[in-house]
């Protein structure tokens, strides 16, 4: 059997090793100049005013929601078709996640669904840019503006994603992820961009103990030896070891996403006559980052269930992923919100399968995946 082909693998090389050696030799390995450089680079990438690096996108979501004052009695609109961390943070703050359905073919929320879910208790809207494609953010933001409700873009899948000619996060507030499987990674990490000066200040304080400075300010520059706690906060700062990796990965992002696009286009072409149906790319002007390539495996059409297909591919040495099992079908949310019914989300959640997609895949790797799927489809 050939070596196992994972569904994702980080692309690391000599440049990343050199960046790590530089930080280790510097004498300062936690939050410091590499963080500052990463934040400046993301302001340049997105065109937004503020960037705050954090230890994870989950931590970023936590402090952003808290900085907006969201708590008990409040509602936050979110898809169920997302990673559970968003809903977990909403619940941990004492607020209520209002889960809405997604478009059946691109798996992103629509402005109409958002509008229908708004109540007097709605305090935030969280659209997800899914699998590397952008949500229709202008239309969703317009709904929020009509009602005076802030929009927090979940851009965990959107490093390199463009919408109508501009990088996701060019205005408003967006949260990126640098987790190990993302288009750019530093193992664990995230970053918030925002054009709201006061929100940026609150987030920056909350992510580091509620202080008005970070570790680099306190211990290296000595600017605030008597720094005070402004409000109780957390420890979500990003180490410079991670930030150094992220900076190198950001330099490689365009080239890496180009390779992802080449692989995705092959999948689209060479699986077109099989019963495995990919997500539909959005109709609005965009540049897809192809974080994931997802097919829907409908047993009635394919002659095999999604779970059985994943097992057979695993036996053939090919890894797959599931992004995601709908949050409202998981134990805690199923028991707390038994009334939630989201037909499009539920149909897709039971059928979606993420195929191998990462920049270091060879053409032979891609051929291997396509051949296995064609074999399993009887084509």
Curated annotation (Swiss-Prot):
Keywords: Aminotransferase, Antibiotic resistance, Lipid A biosynthesis, Lipid biosynthesis, Lipid metabolism, Lipopolysaccharide biosynthesis, Pyridoxal phosphate, Transferase
Any one GO molecular-function label of the UniProt entry: pyridoxal phosphate binding
Pathway info: Nucleotide-sugar biosynthesis; UDP-4-deoxy-4-formamido-beta-L-arabinose biosynthesis; UDP-4-deoxy-4-formamido-beta-L-arabinose from UDP-alpha-D-glucuronate: step 2/3; Bacterial outer membrane biogenesis; lipopolysaccharide biosynthesis
Stored InterPro entries: ArnB_NH2Trfase, DegT/StrS_aminotransferase, PyrdxlP-dep_Trfase, PyrdxlP-dep_Trfase_major, PyrdxlP-dep_Trfase_small
CC cofactor: pyridoxal 5'-phosphate
GO cellular component: membrane
Pfam families per the UniProt record, alphabetical: DegT_DnrJ_EryC1 (PF01041)
CDD domains tied to this protein: AHBA_syn
E.C. code: 2.6.1.87
Broadest EC class assigned to this enzyme: transferase
GO biological process, one term: lipid A biosynthetic process
Top-level taxon of origin: Bacteria
Catalytic reaction list: UDP-4-amino-4-deoxy-beta-L-arabinose + 2-oxoglutarate = UDP-beta-L-threo-pentopyranos-4-ulose + L-glutamate
Sequence intervals crossing the membrane: none
Annotated positions of the N6-(pyridoxal phosphate)lysine modification: 182
Record's subunit section: Homodimer.
PANTHER family (alphabetical): TRANSAMINASE, UDP-4-AMINO-4-DEOXY-L-ARABINOSE--OXOGLUTARATE AMINOTRANSFERASE
NCBIfam families assigned to the protein according to its UniProt record, in alphabetical order: PRK11658.1
Protein task: Catalyzes the conversion of UDP-4-keto-arabinose (UDP-Ara4O) to UDP-4-amino-4-deoxy-L-arabinose (UDP-L-Ara4N). The modified arabinose is attached to lipid A and is required for resistance to polymyxin and cationic antimicrobial peptides.
Family: Belongs to the DegT/DnrJ/EryC1 family. ArnB subfamily.
Protein name (record): UDP-4-amino-4-deoxy-L-arabinose--oxoglutarate aminotransferase
